[in-house]
C-alpha cells in the first residue's frame, strides 16, 4: 500500500512494504528521490535496521552468547508495515510488529 502526503511545498509517497519513501517531489513536480533502475539498482530508500551492510557469516551474537542469523541490511526492508494512522495533509505513522517466525535480534525491544 502506498500513502501520499503533501503540503504547499512538497509531496511524498511512502510504501508500507519496507516502510520506505518512494517519492519526494517539489511543487513543480521535480522528483528528488532515486526512482530505481534495474540496470543499476532497483531499490529506492530502504529502511536498514538494525544494521546497514552484512555481518561476517550473516551471524549476530546477542547478549554475549545467543547467536542468530541476520540478513544483509537487517530485518525490516522486506517486511510489511502496518498503517497506524494518517492525516494525509500532515503525517502518517507506520508500525512494525515483531514477527514470531523471526528470531529476536535485540533485547530492548518495546521498552
Model-derived segments and their meaning:
Residues 1-110:
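Surface-exposed acidic/polar loop and edge beta-strand patches at domain peripheries
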Amino acid at each position: 500500500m502506498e500513502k501520499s502526503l503533501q503540503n504547499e511545498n512538497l509531496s511524498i509517497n511512502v510504501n508500507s512494504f519496507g516502510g520506505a519513501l518512494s517519492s519526494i517531489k517539489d511543487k513543480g513536480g521535480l522528483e528528488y528521490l532515486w526512482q530505481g533502475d534495474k540496470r543499476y539498482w532497483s531499490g529506492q530508500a530502504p529502511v536498514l535496521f538494525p544494521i546497514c551492510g552484512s555481518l561476517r557469516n550473516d551471524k549476530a551474537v546477542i547478549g554475549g552468547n545467543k547467536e542468530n542469523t541476520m540478513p544483509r541490511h537487517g530485518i525490516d526492508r522486506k517486511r510489511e508495515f502496518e498503517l497506524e494512522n494518517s492525516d494525509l495533509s500532515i503525517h502518517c505513522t507506520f508500525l512494525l510488529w515483531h514477527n514470531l517466525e523471526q528470531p529476536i535480534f535485540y533485547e530492548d525491544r518495546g521498552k
